[in-house]
Design a protein with these regions (language model features):
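An N-terminal structural lobe/cap that precedes and organizes the functional/catalytic core
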Residues: 14-21, 25-135
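Short amphipathic alpha-helical surface patches that mediate protein-protein
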Residues: 105, 122-126, 157, 239-243, ...
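Glycine-rich, mobile lid/loop segments that gate access to catalytic sites or pores
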Residues: 139-249
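Helix-hairpin-helix/helix-loop-helix acidic hairpins
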Residues: 236-270
Length: 277
C-alpha cells in the first residue's frame, strides 16, 4: 500500500535544475590544487592509504602484511581490545553461550567480565529494552520511510524528546544513554521494517514485545518473525554477525564523523544519528 502524496513537496522544477547547475559551477575546485596544498581527499593519501586521524586501542583491522617492503593482501584479522575476535567467538561457542553482551562489555570497559559482572551487565541491558509509551504508534508507524537507515535515524533523534537529561554530557549519563541505545536500536530497526512492510508492501503488521530472558540475537529474531520462531543455529549465527559488526578500527566515515561531533560536546542522540545515517 503506497502512501498518498498530496502536494508537490518532492518536485524538481526547471528552476531548481538551473540553480543546481549554477551551484555546481560555483563550487568546483581545480583537482591540481589538492596536490598543490597536500589536501587529503576522503581521508586517503595520494598513495591510497588511510590518513592517520587519531589513536585507538578499541579495535584493529589487519588486512595486509609486509612482503619485501610492500603491503600485500592477507587473511583478514579483527581485534577487539587486543583480543583476536576469532578467539573470542571460539571461547563462547565452545561453552554454548551467546557472546554479544560479553563483547559489548569488553569494548566499553577494556576487560572481559567475570560471571557475576556479565550477569549484572546483561540484566542492565535487558532492563533498558523498553521504548517510551506509545512510541511505536506515534513515531514509527506515522509517515514510515522506505529507507531503513532513515527510519532508524529519525527514531533515535526523537528519543531526545523523551529524555529529561538529553543534554547532560557527563560520563555516567552518556554511558546510560549509550547502553539504552544499544538495547533499543534493534527494536527501532525491526519496528521500522514492520511499518515499511505493512504500509508500503501491504503485508500484515506484527509487533512483538521483547523478552527479558532472551539474548540480543534471540530477541531480534523473536521480534522480527511473524510467529517469533527461530532455530538455535540462526540465533548463534546472528550473535556472531552482530559481534563482527560492532567495531572496525574507527576509521570509516561514520566513526570519524562521530568522533569529530562528539568533541564538540553534542548530545548523545545527535551523535548516534550521524552514526546511523
Amino acid at each position: 500500500m503506497e502512501l498518498q502524496v498530496t502536494n508537490n513537496f518532492s518536485d524538481i522544477t526547471s528552476e531548481i535544475l538551473a540553480l543546481a547547475k549554477m551551484s555546481e559551477q560555483a563550487g568546483s575546485i581545480a583537482p591540481e590544487l589538492y596536490t598543490q596544498y597536500d589536501v587529503k581527499r576522503g581521508l586517503r593519501d595520494l598513495n591510497g592509504k588511510g590518513v592517520l586521524a587519531g589513536l585507538t586501542n578499541i579495535s584493529d583491522v589487519r588486512a595486509t602484511k609486509i612482503v619485501n617492503g610492500e603491503a600485500v593482501p592477507a587473511h583478514g584479522q579483527l581485534f577487539y581490545r587486543g583480543y583476536n575476535v576469532e578467539d573470542l567467538v571460539r571461547g563462547f561457542s565452545k561453552d554454548n553461550r551467546f557472546g554479544f553482551d560479553e563483547v559489548t562489555y569488553l569494548l566499553l570497559f577494556n576487560k572481559l567480565p567475570n560471571k557475576e559482572e556479565l550477569e549484572s551487565f546483561s540484566r542492565l541491558l535487558n532492563s533498558y529494552r523498553s521504548l517510551p509509551t506509545s512510541f511505536v504508534r506515534d513515531i514509527i508507524m506515522k509517515a514510515p520511510s522506505k529507507d531503513m537507515m532513515n527510519t532508524l535515524a529519525r527514531s533515535v533523534l526523537t528519543l531526545y524528546s523523551y529524555d529529561d537529561r538529553a543534554d547532560d554530557v557527563s560520563l555516567p549519563n552518556v554511558l546510560r544513554q549509550c547502553l539504552q541505545l544499544i538495547s533499543l536500536c534493534p527494536m527501532l530497526s525491526i519496528y521500522g521494517y514492520q511499518a515499511y512492510s505493512h504500509y508500503h508492501d501491504g503485508n500484515s503488521l506484527y509487533i512483538h514485545q521483547p523478552s527479558q530472558t532472551l539474548s540480543m540475537a534471540e530477541n531480534i529474531l523473536h521480534i522480527l518473525r511473524p510467529d517469533s520462531s527461530y532455530t538455535p543455529l540462526e540465533a548463534k549465527i546472528l550473535d556472531i554477525a552482530l559481534i563482527l559488526h560492532m567495531e572496525h578500527g574507527g576509521g570509516n566515515n561514520s566513526s570519524f564523523t562521530t568522533r569529530v561531533v562528539t568533541s564538540s560536546l553534542s548530545d548523545t542522540y545527535s551523535v548516534c544519528l550521524l552514526y546511523t545515517s
